[in-house]
Amino acid sequence: MFSHVICKFLLTLSFITIIYAAKSESTINKPEKCGLKASSSSTVRIHYRSRVWGQEEYFESTYIREAPLEVKLGNGNLLKGIEDGIHGMCTGEIRRLLIPPNQAYGAIGIPNLVPPNTAIVVDVEMVNVNSPFSLWFWISGLILFSAFLLFGRKPIKGDTSNIKKKE
């Protein structure tokens, strides 16, 4: 019985290790002050360059086009590995992501660029983060709430406590 429990524990532990080893990221540059962080509902502008694992030549780069990519997270417009890897990034932060095949181009790959079932390395620079719940969101909500309290209060029908009686 005890050996059965240990066996299950070790099997579970090895499974968890395999899952967490599937994707790797490292921060190359992180700003001292981090304002907004990318979240699942953010619209971000990123520069990135991608290469096949084990090769030095990049097959895709927004730096060549000199225009960062603007994308709303959570819509499935990015590779899953990139989208997962940029969560929590600050403006100005640069990360290197090692993305496994199942979160990149999978069993198909990209003909003449990425072989099937191959990991890719993506360097991502966060140019801008625009979150719907930024500071301006909360300030505007506070202003609207204050305006409601000041101007929007009407007496409830039957409540005559604040109306002066005519004599």
Curated annotation (Swiss-Prot):
Inhibited by both FK506 and rapamycin. It is an enzyme of class 5 (isomerase). It catalyses: [protein]-peptidylproline (omega=180) = [protein]-peptidylproline (omega=0). Keywords: Isomerase, Membrane, Rotamase, Signal, Transmembrane, Transmembrane helix. It is found in: Membrane. GO terms for molecular function: peptidyl-prolyl cis-trans isomerase activity. Coiled coil: none annotated. Disulfide bonds: none annotated. Pfam families: FKBP_C. It comes from the Eukaryota. Residues 41-130 form the PPIase FKBP-type domain. GO terms for biological process: chaperone-mediated protein folding. SUPFAM superfamilies: FKBP-like. Its EC number is 5.2.1.8. It is a single-pass membrane protein. Residues 1-21 form the signal peptide. PPIases accelerate the folding of proteins. It catalyzes the cis-trans isomerization of proline imidic peptide bonds in oligopeptides. Belongs to the FKBP-type PPIase family. FKBP2 subfamily. This is FK506-binding protein 2A. It comes from Rhizopus delemar (strain RA 99-880 / ATCC MYA-4621 / FGSC 9543 / NRRL 43880).
